């Protein structure tokens, strides 16, 4: 539903934003497991005791993660406006990446295309995939969308700044800025990422490359620009963006 500025509830937008961020922080930091999924049968267990999830034959539903990814994307898009920094918060991308690779990517059967409903956390357990005409779960409906969305969050932009969020082989054609960029990588099997600007106008451009919170210290990665190694200091464990300016 659309909300106009004449709507009496428009003034509550800040409250809604605060509530959404509180919910996101609670789920991601206190209710989620390593794959980025959460809950069993869409019910949270105690935040300080995951035993029931580890013992259950069911587990996080992919449609829960699907909705968390949607929320994450919206909060990311609005994050620079909330604190007036005009800078998106890369912490949202850290979670998006974790859930995308560890839960969503593994949720489709590679040969017959069935979709996973539950992803059990029980050690040594198995997953059940949907079958045509017998399995139309909620996670099948959202699953049809999940695997068409791998390209939608790789890049983002604000004004003349381009953000490289995810390390996925891709090509970007930014028509407004006259920039064509190619990304080559085998991530997560290999940590090397190559960004090549194939076409560029004379317009001012800032390239913001995400340094994930899991990247560790500066000793754990190296950056080469036009064949020359560059040194950048980062805080270990803190997700950030590394700026490269072209005037």
Predicted regions and their residues:
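Glycan-recognition and catalytic cores of secretory/periplasmic carbohydrate-active enzymes
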Residues: 1-247
């Amino acid at each position: 539903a659309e909300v106009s500025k004449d709507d009496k509830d428009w003034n509550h937008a800040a409250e809604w934003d605060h509530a959404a961020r509180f919910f996101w922080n609670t789920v991601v930091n206190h209710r989620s497991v390593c794959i980025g999924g959460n809950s069993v049968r869409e019910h949270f267990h105690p935040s300080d005791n995951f035993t029931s999830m580890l013992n259950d034959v069911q587990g996080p539903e992919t449609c829960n993660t699907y909705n968390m990814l949607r929320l994450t994307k919206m909060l990311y898009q609005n994050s620079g406006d909330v604190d007036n920094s005009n800078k998106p918060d890369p912490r949202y991308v850290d979670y998006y990446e974790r859930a995308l690779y560890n839960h969503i990517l593994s949720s489709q059967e590679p040969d017959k295309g069935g979709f996973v409903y539950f992803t059990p956390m029980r050690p040594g357990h198995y997953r059940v995939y949907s079958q045509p005409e017998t399995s139309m779960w909620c996670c099948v409906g959202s699953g049809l969308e999940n695997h068409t969305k791998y390209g939608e969050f790789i890049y983002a932009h604000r004004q003349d700044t381009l953000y490289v969020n995810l390390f996925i082989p891709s090509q970007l054609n930014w028509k407004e800025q006259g920039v064509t960029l190619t990304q080559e990588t085998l991530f997560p099997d290999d940590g090397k990422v190559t960004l090549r600007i194939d076409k560029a106008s004379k317009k001012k451009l800032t390239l913001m490359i995400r340094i994930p919170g899991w990247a560790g210290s500066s000793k754990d990665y190296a950056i080469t620009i036009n064949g020359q190694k560059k040194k950048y200091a980062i805080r270990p464990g803190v997700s950030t963006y590394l700026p490269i300016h072209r005037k």
